[in-house]
């Protein structure tokens, strides 16, 4: 990520890494600001991580185009409780149209094949 992170991304202490397949991964370390009940992540922190992963992936795909993604719907499915360890997220663009983009994001901890949450986010691609 860069030095001009939105305040919520800074609060979550998000950082990026390159995955083995070259995909950008978003990483959220476990810390006091993301705790829900003791030993578990807060659902809002997980949703924020998923949204930043989706937005980041879409922003990379839109590089060089004068379009700015604006979320119009977000659906999060919580699959497992997020525990007290680093959480990773990545996103896949399912559809990139002229005006709308559909992105799916997944969050996991130990094993990418066992997600703790997923999100489907629809973006309006707005021109300046």
Residue ranges: model-predicted function:
Residues 1-27, 31-33:
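Non-catalytic linker/capping segments at the edges of enzyme domains
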Residues 10-12, 22-24, 68-74, 85, ...:
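A generic structural signal for short beta-strands and their flanking turns/coil linkers
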Residues 28-57:
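Hot-dog-fold acyl-thioester-processing enzymes
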Residues 28-30, 78, 125:
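Hydrophobic residues in beta-strands and at strand termini
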Residues 55-88, 93:
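Hydrophobic beta-strand-centered segment that forms part of the acyl-chain substrate-binding groove
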Residues 80-84, 88-128:
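HotDog/MaoC-like acyl-thioester-processing domains
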